[in-house]
Amino acid sequence: MSTGWYRSAAALLAAMGLAVLASCSYIPFVGKKSEGQPAAPACPIAVILRPLANTAVFRPGTGAEIRPIDVMFYGIYSDISASCQVNGATLRVSLDNVIAAERGPAAQGNDVDLTYFVSLTASDQTVLGKKSFGVRVSIPDRAKRGGVNDHVEVVFPTAGRPIADLNITAGFQESPQAIQFYKNYRGR
């Protein structure tokens, strides 16, 4: 066979390869996407409000002057993940919340009950709905920390707002003592 035949075959294969690559933009899920509007988000962004990611539980009888030595347990809201379903003007949210507790200097026992909230807010900070949940965290004997993955399901009205305009926010429902404590003592 002559070299001319090989060159013709190579040119033909190269042309076919270019045709295949060019057609990728016409195959769904490959290549260039449609130039229409981007897909709507499936779920609002879920965030833990940093100032409310920590809480403290104090020994009974703690007076007006709260000190770190009075802390029985610290609560740490460490992670949140959400999946959603939209039905008209209603948002059904399935949440997994990772909540930990740590023994404080005044710890008694192994269990602590903490309260956290989940809310749906609009981009202008309007609260469209809020739900509170209680969770018990058990700390194993001789351990400093324990944690739970608390799964909850909530339904919020969206007030007709698009999902892209909404946020899911969460944090601990702070007691007046905890608010005062964190004003005076930074950190945990």
Regions flagged by a language model, labelled:
Residues 40, 128-188:
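Helix-rich interaction surfaces within compact, conserved domain-sized segments
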